[in-house]
């Protein structure tokens, strides 16, 4: 896999950080044709994220930061759903942005690593939990790393990539 093969990006966790990561990816990835899936197992979080996305895009258009056509493109390429397994199965790159609880993260990574494509890249947005604490529950730890967005993710231009001892050089290069 190379960077051109990345077509579908899934962000798991529709809290404030997950929403911003997904929107940032959808807006900045539109020139690359990314499809972005923001998912959360809690329906209430999905509803809030959908409402937030609509409001955010409308505001960007009103301020002249996006054209109406660009906002429509983002809407067409940003799916917000409660189907975490479906999102994981479709994604080429998965960014986990759920609660900072190691047990919950390990359960999620164990589940999604069995569902995702064999060459999918798995990442955690955590700044507190290194990917090496998740590697042993994944099917392919060489495709796992930390991708740490700084808050607020929609404003900050900095994303930290942290390679674990299990992470392949190829994964970092993509």
Located regions from the model:
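Rossmann-fold dinucleotide-binding core
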Residues: 121-174
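N-terminal alpha-helical segment
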Residues: 53, 105, 154-158
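NAD(P)+-binding Rossmann beta1-loop-alpha1 motif at the extreme N-terminus of oxidoreductases
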Residues: 1-56, 115
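Rossmann-like NAD(P)-binding element
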Residues: 16, 41-48, 59-122, 129-130
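Short, well-ordered coil loops that connect the C-terminus of an alpha-helix to the N-terminus
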Residues: 31, 100, 118, 140-141
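Conserved beta-strand segments of alpha/beta enzyme cores
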Residues: 35, 77-79, 143
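Short amphipathic alpha-helical segments
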Residues: 22-25, 50-51, 106-109, 134-136
């Amino acid at each position: 896999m190379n960077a051109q093969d990345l077509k579908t990006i899934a962000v798991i966790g529709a809290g404030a950080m997950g929403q911003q990561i997904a929107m940032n990816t959808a807006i900045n990835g539109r020139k690359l044709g990314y499809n972005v899936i923001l998912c959360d197992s809690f329906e209430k979080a999905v509803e809030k994220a959908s409402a937030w996305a609509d409001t955010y895009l409308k505001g960007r258009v009103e301020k002249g930061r996006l054209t109406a056509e660009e906002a429509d493109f983002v809407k067409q390429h940003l799916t917000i759903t409660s189907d975490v397994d479906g999102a994981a199965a479709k994604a080429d790159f998965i960014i986990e942005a759920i609660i900072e609880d190691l047990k919950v993260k390990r359960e999620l990574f164990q589940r999604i690593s069995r569902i995702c494509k064999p060459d999918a890249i798995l990442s955690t947005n955590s700044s507190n939990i290194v990917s090496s604490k998740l590697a042993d529950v994944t099917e392919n730890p060489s495709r796992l790393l930390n991708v740490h967005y700084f808050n607020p993710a929609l404003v900050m231009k900095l994303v930290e990539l942290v390679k674990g001892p299990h992470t392949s050089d190829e994964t970092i290069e993509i």
